[in-house]
Curated annotation (Swiss-Prot):
Residues 103-226 form the MPN domain. This is UPF0758 protein Daro_3142. Keywords: Hydrolase, Metal-binding, Metalloprotease, Protease, Zinc. The lineage of its organism: Bacteria, Pseudomonadati, Pseudomonadota, Betaproteobacteria, Rhodocyclales. Belongs to the UPF0758 family.
Length: 226
């Protein structure tokens, strides 16, 4: 059944107009963007198929290639291009917010950006957000990549990068592809080692985030682990 044949109160667009976007499911929001379905499937059905293909995770969907998106029945290259453009605009909007001087007074913005960057990665990635003395972003840099379960991080190389960017502070982050955001003993020990090494060159570690799946990134600072 086409969405136009649904009761008005159940149609995604009408629900958004009445209750706002936060009231809609991921599939309903995608359906509004897709606009129309295909023979035998409404736009909501098509959106559900799309989410199912990418494990129900918007982060994984956002990282999919054009070819991967277009391979879903009913999507095609035109809709795939529209989706990629939408995800890229979201990334750019967050990046622009990150470049403003008050970016790092809002942990929520940092979390959102890190989730976009790291949540769907299939292997561990360790990155640093280098900041100046006013906590304005100098550079977001992926320093090390590893396997599904671990990555090797070398404090000496992190210190070299800090000096190269003339950084005054840093926010560290890495992902757990397992989907579990809890820090391991190795994570805690590494954080202490990096904090001590960077302190030797007057670079302050403001936080260390672990990004895992759709859960909010875990903050070492909030856990009292810094």
């Amino acid at each position: 059944m086409a969405i136009t044949d649904w009761p008005e109160g159940e149609r995604p667009r009408e629900r958004l107009l009445a209750h706002g976007p936060a009231a809609l499911s991921d599939a309903e929001l995608l359906a509004i963007y897709l606009r129309v379905g295909v023979r035998g499937k409404s736009a909501v059905d098509l959106a559900r198929d799309l989410l199912h293909r990418f494990d129900g995770r918007l982060g994984t969907l956002a990282e999919a290639s054009l070819e991967e998106l277009a391979s879903v029945s009913g999507i095609g290259m035109a809709k795939a291009a529209q989706l990629k453009a939408s995800f890229e605009l979201t990334r750019r909007a967050l990046s622009q917010e990150m470049a403003t001087r008050d970016s790092f007074t809002s942990p929520g913005k940092v979390r959102d950006w890190l989730r976009l960057k790291l949540a769907s990665r299939g292997h561990e990635v360790f990155m640093a957000l280098w900041l100046d003395a006013q906590n304005q972003l100098l550079k977001a840099e992926e320093l090390f990549t590893g396997t599904l379960t671990q990555t090797s991080v070398y404090p000496r190389e992190v210190v070299k990068a800090a000096l190269a960017h003339n950084a005054a502070a840093v926010i560290l982050a890495h992902n757990h592809p397992s989907g579990i955001a809890e820090p391991s003993r190795a994570d805690e020990m590494l954080t202490r080692s990096l904090k001590e090494a960077l302190a030797m060159v007057d670079v302050k570690v403001l936080d260390h985030f672990i990004v895992a799946g759709n859960t909010p990134p875990l903050s070492f600072a909030e856990r009292g682990l810094l």
